[in-house]
Amino acid sequence: MSYGDSREKILSAATRLFQLQGYYGTGLNQIIKESGAPKGSLYYHFPGGKEQLAIEAVNEMKEYIRQKIADCMEACTDPAEGIQAFLKELSCQFSCTEDIEGLPVGLLAAETSLKSEPLREACHEAYKEWASVYEEKLRQTGCSESRAKEASTVVNAMIEGGILLSLTAKNSTPLLHISSCIPDLLKR
């Protein structure tokens, strides 16, 4: 296993486990086992330990989700349709409960925001980054800056809540309900 391989495998395993089990439910030994990387490589690549690994996992998810949102928004001229396209894509993961990926950063944010300032900040930056994609599209289509900022925050909160509700329901109905409300939300 090469230098980059080992690091990427550790980060990939950690990202998936943090999404599914949270920060406190995920142990370093489990990450090592699932990644297949040598134990010493974890601290070599992540000298800051579990917290550094979690921050990098959040940053990976931030970029991954930002790109998914951007792709959906760019494919549509209407911001509401772009958001609905993202919600449709997101809701597909709930059609098979074995494939559910968990919360992109929500679980980590809820668990650690009061205990780890660097991890809280990483989660906050992820949410800001995602909101900025919605906000930019809304401004491009004539929405005022203040209204675009407000609407993007509401959309982000609705989606994060919808993911949580869909996880507990083990279906995509909450996300689909949110999707149907998006056009009216953006009209006001």
Swiss-Prot record:
Signal peptide feature range: none
Does the record bear DNA-binding in its keywords?
yes
Keywords from the UniProt entry: DNA-binding, Repressor, Transcription, Transcription regulation
- State if Repressor is listed as a keyword: yes
Q: Name one GO molecular function term.
A: DNA binding
Q: Which domain of life is it from?
A: Bacteria
**Residue ranges occupied by any HTH tetR-type domain in the UniProt entry:** 4-64
The record's section on Pfam families has: TetR_C_13_2, TetR_N
Locate the DNA-binding region by residue range. 27-46
Alphabetical list of PANTHER family matching this protein = HTH-TYPE TRANSCRIPTIONAL REGULATOR LMRA (PTHR47506:SF3), TRANSCRIPTIONAL REGULATORY PROTEIN (PTHR47506)
Its function, per the record, reads: Acts as a repressor of the lincomycin-resistance (lmrAB) and yxaGH operons.
Provide the protein name: HTH-type transcriptional regulator LmrA
